[in-house]
């Protein structure tokens, strides 16, 4: 069996699918190591993989990003994403590259399995495939590839609509400047690592340079882009294995009313007033049941006035709750959206930071939900969107179509096949 090194950016949305992959590969008999932040050591060891920590100077705590990057609190949307790309993703590349190369040499690594948000692999990807070990990429974010209207994480205008818009300018000057600054940051980090500058946008290299790219979604959630044909394979979401779960204490309080799950995820949840509180206030008098999760934060942060139709908890096991849900209200975390769609649950999405605007755009484009186009929607806006999704069957019908498409895919089998093929090619 082979020695396989997994690497993931140290945030839950990036790590969780990689833990499923780690458990899968350990079960296949491979020796599996996983390089990640120290916060995730326990989960990595529980998967059966050997844990290796990021170097301390680039091991950021995702729960306190404003402490690492104080200016983040003053930014939103594209500007916040640009800051994250420069400081959180690009700047650590030289340190990550040194760690990767040392591990590969010391541990005799045969294959590198990376999620597409870990840019520390770019120096290795700059090498010819014949001069490096095989690299398999897992897509845990919206597909990121340049286009005339792309803002870091892909087009916000469905490709089929572009022709009807004629020669209208796609991006404003400020956005173009941000993109140029981010690309320069990646080139500077690569130069520090001793690698040449990128010959294409950094997002494109992460798609074209790996030996294989597996996207954890279905084609129905992504725009049709002929230029990506043959580069990306959609394999469906990589959800945790089905196990018997002990229902949480609040489970017995669920009744027959439509269940509305509301989550700000585990990253953008410092201010619960962005989504949880507006949803709670806007739907307090509705004939629905609210299940509000603070994503690990103290539920007391929502205050003492909790409506009678609401349940507040710091964690919701999606695999248990989503089959009962009428709608998921979220700020657009890619993994949460894929989990909802796998269960045929429609969505209301309110995120604009990180890659969440791209997720929200795809939710609306694919017909599986409503994009609120705001990081801080009003109570009225959230309530109106939830009522529309709950009472208009077309959203659930579209979500069920994507669930059927996902049901025909097998992410685990696809990963096994890709790993076997790449290892055989390397021999």
Q: Which stretches of residues belong to each language-model region?
A:
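Nucleotide-activated sugar donor-binding and catalytic core shared by glycosyltransferases
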Residues: 3-10, 18-33, 43-50, 103-106, ...
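Short, well-ordered alpha-helical microsegments
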Residues: 15, 40-41, 120-123, 337
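Short gly/pro/ser/thr-enriched loop/turn and capping motifs at secondary-structure boundaries
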Residues: 41-42, 58-62, 141-148, 356-358, ...
